[in-house]
Amino acid sequence: MHLSEITHPNQLHGLSIQELKQIARQIRDKHLETVAATGGHLGPGLGVVELTLGLYQTLDLDRDRVIWDVGHQAYPHKLLTGRYDRFHTLRQKDGVAGYLNRKESEFDHFGAGHASTSISAALGMALARDQRGETHKVVAIIGDGALTGGMSLEAINHAGHLPHTNLMVVLNDNEMSISPNVGALSRYLNKMRLNPQVQFITENLEEQIKHFVGDSITPELGRLKGGMKRLAVPKVGAVFEELGFTYVGPVDGHNLEELIATFNAAHKIPGPVLVHVATVKGKGYAIAEKDQVGYHAQNPFNLATGKAMPSSKPKPPSYSKVFGDTLTKLAEADSRIIGITAAMATGTGLDILQKHLPDQYIDVGIAEQHAVTMAAGLACEGMRPVVTIYSTFLQRAYDQIVHDVCIQSLPVLFCMDRAGIVGADGPTHQGMYDIAYLRCLPNMVLMAPKDEAELQQMLVTGINYMDGPIGLRYPRGNGYGVALMEEGWEPLPIGKAEVLRQGDDLLMLAYGSMVYPTLQAAEILREHGIAATVVNARFAKPLDTELILPLAEKLGRVVTVEEGCLIGGFGSAVLEALQDQEILVPVTRIGIPDILVEHATPDQSKAQLGLTSAQIAERVLAKTQQPAPSRV
């Protein structure tokens, strides 16, 4: 059988080990071929090919539920569930999503793009099953560092206290979280654990001894029974046993015979079970095996060399690169500066700080809540913590931002990379909401640069601001190629905007990444006889009302432009300020409406949302041709 013939995972039933190995090779070939062409997550999926095949051969996926953590591990799952013919469209507009999506397939039982959610979701499904008196299996597959997230540990703690709820957790240990040895001893211990006679002895030991000596030594029996149960458990497994799980493993995650035997046996164990599978991230592609962090995810690349496809022309440095370089220079001069990341050093540019000043760098793992409150503690002691995080992941620490930072007005700088449209990763990763969810918080200041040079200024501004927390958002991708400063940066005055273009017909207020597109739109409007004043707002909170309100009243029409959600966003802030002063002028808000933005290139998404320069100009032209509403 060829992989292309598999449209349902139950077709794996009955295949020989040799046939499964052939399917495994075909999965890796298709995975590599596709990601090299489209970009995407490379290492995680390559590491779980045999795990997926072995598990799915032991399940009935017309009934059973499998929940993949994060979702970027699940490319093999997609190839086995009817998406082979469309897999070449991975992460492309209207193509196969890069993460799991309940709308895309009946086998995507739970959507996920953020880490550490699978065990909680699986436990909910298992409890629903039990309520209905059903008997199907529920399996959560977690790993690739996701076990460092507090939510997964909360779920394990809860599930471990439900001895009558059958739930299997498969820990894909690819050395990104924990990594015990795999070998002959481990296989022997695992075999011993699964031996029915050993299980019978450990579960019935107490009753057998009581039969002969009575109840007088019950406390000692409990300790003896616990010791027997832990006899064959590797050290790491004892932790899960103490939390109420039956621990099985570690198992060689690339040995199909061992995986199938282990899963079949583990399915028979009642209650919560954890199967520990040791895998190699990037398995089957030597370049990715050697550089597991670098090949976690890739842009399109040359499969033979592993190198990125050359660009048609040189590109300016990315915002992340400018951020990392600038923060490192500032940290060299100020030992109070501490860069904090939640397992995203390379993506955020903090790997530059890590390399040059490791003592001023902290990686907390996938633990955003901890990162924020730890930063609050650092700020209490006079340090200058810089929490560097993707906009979408900062959502995970909202209570900590409110309770531990804002209420105490602590000087924590939040640097939100990937703010706005991020592209191929889709709705789980769009950075659309940060303006809205942070603007409502007392003591919070919000700013966004128009280009990479202003990013440098704002980074200096944030580090020097001591009156409370400050949020700095900036987009994914490359800057505009403007000249960068090497030193001598001065903080910007808080809450002050700048006028970039003068005109007498209307006021255009742009925030962050939309400043340059708005300037281009103003030029198009000029060609149509409309002269716009363009303001780089710089700050969404506090607004520069001393500048904005008189201009709005004088010019009589306002347009706001932002790369964020319209509900509660920058445009809403402007409307509120105008209303508070009873300045009743027409306001057109341009931004992201109340929809989910699916995976596509950033340019495709912006065109779909009406955020190109030409579309902004068209929207303004359409509005200016309408009579202004009465101010009465």
Curated annotation (Swiss-Prot):
The entry's keywords: Isoprene biosynthesis, Magnesium, Metal-binding, Thiamine biosynthesis, Thiamine pyrophosphate, Transferase
Cysteine-cysteine disulfides: none
SUPFAM superfamilies, per database record: Thiamin diphosphate-binding fold (THDP-binding), TK C-terminal domain-like
Annotated residues for binding of Mg(2+): D144, N174
Gene Ontology MF annotations: 1-deoxy-D-xylulose-5-phosphate synthase activity; magnesium ion binding; thiamine pyrophosphate binding
Entry GO terms, CC: cytosol
Pathway this chain belongs to: Metabolic intermediate biosynthesis; 1-deoxy-D-xylulose 5-phosphate biosynthesis; 1-deoxy-D-xylulose 5-phosphate from D-glyceraldehyde 3-phosphate and pyruvate: step 1/1
Biological process according to GO: 1-deoxy-D-xylulose 5-phosphate biosynthetic process; isopentenyl diphosphate biosynthetic process, methylerythritol 4-phosphate pathway; terpenoid biosynthetic process; thiamine biosynthetic process
Cofactor: Mg(2+); thiamine diphosphate
Class of enzymatic activity (EC top level): transferase
EC annotation from Swiss-Prot or TrEMBL: 2.2.1.7
Alphabetical list of InterPro entries matching this protein: Dxylulose-5-P_synthase (IPR005477), THDP-binding (IPR029061), Transketo_C/PFOR_II (IPR009014), Transketolase-like_Pyr-bd (IPR005475), Transketolase_BS (IPR020826), Transketolase_C (IPR033248), Transketolase_CS (IPR049557)
Residues where thiamine diphosphate binds: H72, G113, H114, A115, G145, A146, N174, Y285, E368
Cofactor note: Binds 1 Mg(2+) ion per subunit.
Enzymatic reactions: D-glyceraldehyde 3-phosphate + pyruvate + H(+) = 1-deoxy-D-xylulose 5-phosphate + CO2
Keyword Lyase: no
Function: Catalyzes the acyloin condensation reaction between C atoms 2 and 3 of pyruvate and glyceraldehyde 3-phosphate to yield 1-deoxy-D-xylulose-5-phosphate (DXP).
Quaternary structure annotation from Swiss-Prot or TrEMBL: Homodimer.
Family affiliation: Belongs to the transketolase family. DXPS subfamily.
Protein name: 1-deoxy-D-xylulose-5-phosphate synthase
Species annotation: Cyanothece sp. (strain PCC 7425 / ATCC 29141)
